[in-house]
């Protein structure tokens, strides 16, 4: 008899949820502090009240064994001696509209818990109580119903019989999938050099899973240079492991849409090579990008009265799933949009619901790591998941951003202005919070006056609005670090967070009472900003610092996560294994440290391409340090000219900043007008990016030199194979800009391990260098030249970070020597 594991809440909601998607503001997140409210009510219930009681049972229905699990909010015995199952729900529904039958799912959940508990305790009957906590009034409304054990059993059996066809569908698919994956063959005639080694490492990690030594799951770092075929080298072995029962679902997590497409292409290749392959995949895309019915401003309008795809969604979704799951399929963005139109359902929610029935889920990092938007249906508890994390060199910065939060004083000032004249609880709360941040701004300027090297014209308010005899009413703690109107504190500033928390309740009340107000969107944005900063405060620990920055009349409050290691570690622990891979993961000690994988195995694979295909040169007589940049402009221009004049074709030059890029481009265009150039603008959408890259045509009639920024959208994740790109120059070692935040990061890691400069500057910089250089050689047939421009590339601190396939680098003395060696390279 087949066995199906089924969370009780999932059973109830799947069968009984009806109606529409409705994302109108209800303030429900204020109640979700729901967990806090639950604990508050549970504590108030007294000593005889058992809170969060774990219940599980095996029940048979339709020749299937169901393993049901869940947690009852509370179980107690009342004054009559009757056992009561308490189901607590927080709600923003007005008290007069809270009725006994307003949500059948609530009773159903309590009744299932009751059926399990009554059977285990041999109780002939018990009570189920619904406790509604109304978040606006703090009112508690309760409803009680008595059930016999027989009635509860009949109810549970009925639910299981209704779910049985869906369970049978899952069982049959799992058998078919396992058989199919066990016979899966590598889709190419042979492995590329290094590809089998990478596949073997990932296969072993997936098989190992959680062990006594790896309770958070097996972790693997794999540095695989361009050309190995990382995507297939990761997916194929993970799927083979799944076919052997090692992993229930595979999550392929990426930093960019381009790598999501690579994963889709790899899966399509497997389907093409093995047409009967039983494998379903879904690609999750941001709601804003897949919405079929946006509002006038282009934003999703997830309201039943505005969107036909939201209206009645839960009434139609099971029919849509039934039709879509009858075959094998790859549900990418286009397929989801087509299915959504066909069944008149929201494509974003359809993707989420399909993910529960798919074997491979492709999506952004945030679906696992972001504390707000992660997939709660999977990751609120651990599961038999396999994680493949592509472009893992991006994860440290992305993770820091996910766990940090930022709030601007101006949003309070603008909200007060938007509300107009008159008194209200909201305006009072906004005024208090605004005043607190104003005083913090004064204290910030006093603690960290702007240096004279900064122009007063750029920030006149630093002096004109703060007379010398001004004494801020708010006194900040002794700062960790203070410079140029930026102050870092170890502890979160309660004097600022408390008034911001006090804004939430009246702001919520206003939003609920004024859904059609012209400024509703503005105040809703403020609500979410306050919510973000207060949520970050709840996570705040020794891995965070507080940053206060005064700019003119503005004060920015940031709760900065300097070290995301414990949070990334906790996220990865939700699965059985995690393989993190990239072309640049050196040194491994750095990534182990910042990603919380101290015991992870790390492997570095050699490049599969012949070394002679890459001409690698360095002119170490040029300094591109910030203080030397103006003096270096002509030398850099001349070196770029020698690079591109050696052979007609497409080239890129990558710079550490837009300002330096523009300086050199202006000089280059003036002195070498015969060479066509393209300049990367600071903000390009997907269409503009594609248009830019389309200029890099195969075998061009004239030379093209693109000017781009290291670490930007062209510095990595771009595949210009063959003659679409035959060379690039890397101008500088890519160090992040020196600023107070980066300096705080350096100080933090200096205190942690003594490698502050490496962690904050050198390692991230060289990562960008290696990523940019990796754009040139994409296939075994490619030939190309890479030119490094900076004297630091000749220093041991940087040479030790070079990959093995850079051993043949040549250091040159002049542009004339560069021209000569390039001529030799291209003539071979």
Language model region names:
Residues 178, 185, 246-361, 369, ...:
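A substrate-engagement module of RecA-like helicase motors
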Residues 656-681:
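Conserved helicase motor "Helicase C" RecA-like lobe of SF1/SF2 P-loop NTPases
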């Amino acid at each position: 008899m087949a066995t199906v594991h089924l969370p009780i809440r999932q059973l109830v909601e799947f069968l009984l949820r009806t109606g529409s998607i409705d994302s109108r503001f209800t303030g429900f997140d204020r109640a979700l502090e729901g967990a806090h409210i639950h604990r508050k009510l549970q504590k108030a219930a007294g000593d005889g009240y058992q809170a969060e009681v774990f219940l599980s049972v095996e029940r048979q229905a339709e020749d299937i064994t169901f393993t049901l699990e869940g947690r009852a909010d509370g179980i107690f015995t009342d004054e009559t001696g009757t056992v009561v199952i308490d189901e607590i729900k927080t709600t923003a529904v007005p008290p007069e509209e809270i009725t006994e039958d307003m949500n059948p799912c609530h009773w159903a959940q309590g009744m299932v818990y009751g059926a399990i508990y009554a059977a285990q305790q041999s109780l002939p009957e018990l009570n189920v109580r619904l406790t509604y906590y109304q978040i606006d009034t703090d009112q508690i409304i309760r409803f009680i119903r008595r059930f016999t054990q027989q009635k509860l059993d009949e109810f549970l059996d009925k639910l299981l019989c209704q779910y049985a066809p869906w369970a049978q569908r899952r069982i049959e698919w799992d058998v078919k999938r396992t058989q199919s994956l066990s016979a899966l063959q590598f889709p190419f005639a042979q492995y590329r050099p290094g590809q089998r080694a990478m596949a073997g490492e990932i296969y072993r990690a997936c098989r190992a899973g959680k062990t006594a030594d790896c309770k958070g799951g097996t972790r693997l770092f794999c540095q695989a240079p361009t050309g190995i075929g990382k995507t297939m080298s990761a997916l194929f072995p993970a799927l083979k492991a799944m076919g052997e029962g090692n992993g229930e679902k595979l999550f392929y997590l990426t930093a960019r849409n381009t790598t999501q497409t690579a994963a889709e292409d790899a899966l399509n290749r497997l389907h093409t090579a093995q047409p009967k392959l039983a494998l379903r995949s879904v690609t999750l895309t941001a709601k804003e990008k897949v919405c079929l019915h946006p509002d006038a401003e282009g934003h999703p309008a997830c309201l039943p009265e505005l969107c036909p795809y939201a209206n009645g969604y839960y009434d139609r979704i099971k029919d849509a799933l039934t039709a879509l799951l009858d075959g094998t399929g790859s549900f990418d963005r286009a397929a989801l949009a087509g299915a959504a139109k066909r069944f008149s359902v929201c494509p974003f929610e359809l993707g989420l619901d399909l993910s529960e029935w798919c074997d491979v889920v492709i999506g952004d990092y945030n679906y696992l790591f972001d504390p707000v938007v992660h997939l709660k249906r999977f990751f609120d508890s651990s599961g038999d998941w396999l994680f493949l994390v592509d472009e893992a060199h991006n994860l440290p910065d992305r993770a820091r951003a996910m766990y940090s939060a930022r709030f601007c004083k101006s949003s309070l000032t603008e909200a007060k202005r938007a509300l107009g004249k008159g008194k209200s609880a909201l305006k009072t709360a906004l005024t208090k919070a605004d005043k607190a941040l104003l005083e913090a701004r004064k204290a910030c300027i006093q603690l960290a006056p702007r240096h004279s090297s900064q122009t007063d014209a750029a920030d006149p308010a630093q002096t004109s609005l703060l007379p010398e005899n001004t004494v801020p009413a708010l006194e900040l703690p002794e700062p960790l670090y203070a410079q140029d109107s930026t102050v870092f504190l170890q502890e979160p500033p309660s004097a600022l967070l408390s008034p911001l928390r006090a804004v939430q309740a009246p702001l919520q009340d206003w939003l609920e009472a004024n859904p059609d107000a012209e400024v509703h969107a503005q105040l809703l944005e403020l609500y979410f900003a306050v919510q973000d900063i207060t949520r970050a405060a709840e996570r705040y620990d020794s891995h965070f610092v507080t940053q206060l920055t005064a700019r003119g009349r503005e004060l920015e409050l940031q709760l900065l996560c300097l070290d995301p290691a414990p949070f990334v570690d906790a996220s990865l622990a939700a699965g059985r294994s995690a393989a993190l891979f990239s072309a640049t993961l050196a040194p491994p000690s750095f990534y182990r440290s910042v990603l919380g994988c101290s015991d992870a195995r790390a492997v570095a694979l050699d490049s599969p391409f012949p070394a002679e295909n890459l001409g690698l040169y360095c002119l170490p007589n040029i300094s591109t340090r910030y203080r030397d940049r103006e003096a270096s402009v002509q030398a850099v221009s001349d070196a770029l000219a020698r690079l591109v004049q050696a052979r007609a074709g497409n080239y890129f030059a990558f710079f550490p900043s837009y300002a330096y890029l523009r300086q050199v481009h202006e000089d280059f265009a003036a002195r070498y007008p015969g060479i066509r150039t393209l300049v990367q603008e600071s903000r390009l959408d997907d269409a503009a990016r594609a248009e830019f890259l389309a200029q890099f045509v195969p075998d061009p009639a004239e030379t093209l030199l693109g000017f781009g920024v290291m670490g930007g959208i062209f510095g990595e994740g771009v595949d210009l194979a063959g003659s679409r790109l035959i060379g690039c120059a890397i101008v500088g070692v890519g160090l992040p800009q020196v600023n107070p935040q980066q300096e705080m990061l350096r100080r933090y890691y200096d205190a942690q391990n003594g490698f502050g400069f490496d962690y904050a500057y050198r390692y991230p910089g060289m990562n960008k260098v290696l990523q940019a250089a990796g754009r040139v050689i994409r296939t075994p047939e490619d030939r190309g030249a890479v030119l490094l421009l900076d004297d630091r590339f000749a220093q041991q601190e940087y040479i030790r970070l070079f990959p093995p396939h850079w051993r043949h680098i040549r250091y040159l003395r002049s542009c004339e020597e560069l021209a000569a060696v390039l001529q030799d390279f291209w003539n071979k």
